[in-house]
């Protein structure tokens, strides 16, 4: 689960980290009032969406009057912000963050992720702040500094000081960085985060360090023990198809192709997407119906897949283990009839009663193509999507 910038900064403040004074507002009038509360003559207004690249898309602006702040809120509230990290529809803006202006001398980067290979939290720091860190890691990996956190003892101040020295910080900045480093590490562990970024972490004109941005992603599997953070969830930022899928315990991720994929098992789903790509097709989604490919789940899966107007054909790849393939085939037939599927559907069944399942599909009289193998299924669905 992603958090908005203002929510991330709220958590930063709770851990004693330096953040700008600001208010999240949802009306133009509240934006103007926020300027009065903050004081000063310059403010930064930011559209709140779960995506990066807001500045280049016009979603971040420096304003010098509360009227301009209100105008910015009027411009964006209720609209959709399109950035390089969103799809063509963009993300809806329901909140504007109004905060004090910061005089920046230098921008740094500080972030943390769970490193699966070492099974540790790993902090990354760089002198190249304010830019896409993935590009820096790809083009100049030597500019990425790392510190691995031992889960038994947690982040240690000496690790923060070591990173600070490597970043070229001096004097009070070293102490400040170490405090920010250990504070972020504690926040990361306390709240079961999957990712945390401060980009940029800035050196102000007076030499002090300041967290100018906050990006936080929480491990969805840990939400059951983070009741406080459940209230931070903003459903307006969810993909409606993914939200629909979650209600039926389906794992769905939208992609940009035209071949819908319905599979039971995450590994098989990824393999299916790979083989579709191998044969020249482009998957429109990742969809794992899980172990129980019942008629109800298959029906909802079809509804979700077909809600994407780009889908020209559907590949159903099911391995029958405990559930027999003939029962799965009957569920697929019932779902196709109920939903009224008009596009070609290619089905590959393997496992328990696979031959009987293929026979049931062949005798259904529906526009369902029974594939003999995974390769055959991929070839058939690519042809069907191309109208051949």
Swiss-Prot record:
Q: What class of enzyme is it?
A: ligase
Coiled-coil regions, chain positions = none
* Keyword Zinc-finger included in the entry's annotation: no
The residues listed in the UniProt record as binding ATP, with positions renumbered to this chain, are: 46, 53-55, 99, 102, 107
Give me the reactions it catalyses. Answer: succinate + ATP + CoA = succinyl-CoA + ADP + phosphate; GTP + succinate + CoA = succinyl-CoA + GDP + phosphate
Q: What is its EC number?
A: 6.2.1.5
The pathway it acts in is: Carbohydrate metabolism; tricarboxylic acid cycle; succinate from succinyl-CoA (ligase route): step 1/1
Q: Which residues does the record give as Mg(2+) binding sites?
A: 199, 213
Domain of life, source organism: Bacteria
Keywords attached to this Swiss-Prot or TrEMBL record, sorted alphabetically, are:
ATP-binding, Ligase, Magnesium, Metal-binding, Nucleotide-binding, Tricarboxylic acid cycle
- How many cofactors are bound and how? Binds 1 Mg(2+) ion per subunit.
Q: Could you provide one GO biological process annotation from this protein's UniProt record?
A: succinyl-CoA metabolic process
Q: What GO CC terms are in its UniProt record? A: cytosol; succinate-CoA ligase complex
Which function does this protein serve?
Answer: Succinyl-CoA synthetase functions in the citric acid cycle (TCA), coupling the hydrolysis of succinyl-CoA to the synthesis of either ATP or GTP and thus represents the only step of substrate-level phosphorylation in the TCA. The beta subunit provides nucleotide specificity of the enzyme and binds the substrate succinate, while the binding sites for coenzyme A and phosphate are found in the alpha subunit.
User: Quaternary structure per UniProt?
Assistant: Heterotetramer of two alpha and two beta subunits.
Would you identify the family this protein belongs to, as annotated? Belongs to the succinate/malate CoA ligase beta subunit family.
Please give the name of this protein: Succinate--CoA ligase [ADP-forming] subunit beta
- State the organism of origin: Pseudomonas syringae pv. syringae (strain B728a)
- Cite the source lineage: Bacteria, Pseudomonadati, Pseudomonadota, Gammaproteobacteria, Pseudomonadales
């Amino acid at each position: 689960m992603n958090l908005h910038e203002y929510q991330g900064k709220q958590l930063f403040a709770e851990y004693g980290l330096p953040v700008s004074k600001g208010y999240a507002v949802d009306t133009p009038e509240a934006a103007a009032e926020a300027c009065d509360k903050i004081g000063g003559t310059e403010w930064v207004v930011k559209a709140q969406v779960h995506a990066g690249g807001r500045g280049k898309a016009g979603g971040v602006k420096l304003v010098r009057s509360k009227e301009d702040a209100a105008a910015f809120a009027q411009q964006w509230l209720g609209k959709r912000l399109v950035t390089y990290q969103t799809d063509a529809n963009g993300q809806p803006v329901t909140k504007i963050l109004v905060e004090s202006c910061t005089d920046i001398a230098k921008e740094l980067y500080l972030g943390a992720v769970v490193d699966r290979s070492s099974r540790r939290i790993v902090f990354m720091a760089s002198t190249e702040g304010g830019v896409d860190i993935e590009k820096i890691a790809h083009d100049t990996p030597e500019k990425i500094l790392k510190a691995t956190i031992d889960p038994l003892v947690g982040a240690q101040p000496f690790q923060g000081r070591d990173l600070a020295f490597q970043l070229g910080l001096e004097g009070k900045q070293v102490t400040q960085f170490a405090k920010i480093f250990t504070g972020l590490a504690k926040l990361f562990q306390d709240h079961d985060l999957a990712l945390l970024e401060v980009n940029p972490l800035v050196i102000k004109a007076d030499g002090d360090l300041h967290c100018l941005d906050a990006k936080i992603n929480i491990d969805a599997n840990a939400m059951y023990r983070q009741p406080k953070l459940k209230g931070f969830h903003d459903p307006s930022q969810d993909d409606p198809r993914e939200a629909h899928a979650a209600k039926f315990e389906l794992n769905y991720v939208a992609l940009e192709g035209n071949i819908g994929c319905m599979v039971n098992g995450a590994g098989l789903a990824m393999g299916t997407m790979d083989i579709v790509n191998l044969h020249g097709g482009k998957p429109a989604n990742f969809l794992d119906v899980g172990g129980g490919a019942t008629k109800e789940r298959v029906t909802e899966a079809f509804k979700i897949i077909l809600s994407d107007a780009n889908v020209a054909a559907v590949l159903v790849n099911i391995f029958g283990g405990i559930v027999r393939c003939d029962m799965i085939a009957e569920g697929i037939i019932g779902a196709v009839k109920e939903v009224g599927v008009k596009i070609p559907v290619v089905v590959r069944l393997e496992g328990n009663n696979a031959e009987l399942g293929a026979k049931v599909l062949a005798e259904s009289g529906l526009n369902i193509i029974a594939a003999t193998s995974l390769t055959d299924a991929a070839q058939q669905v690519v042809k069907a999507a191309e109208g051949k």
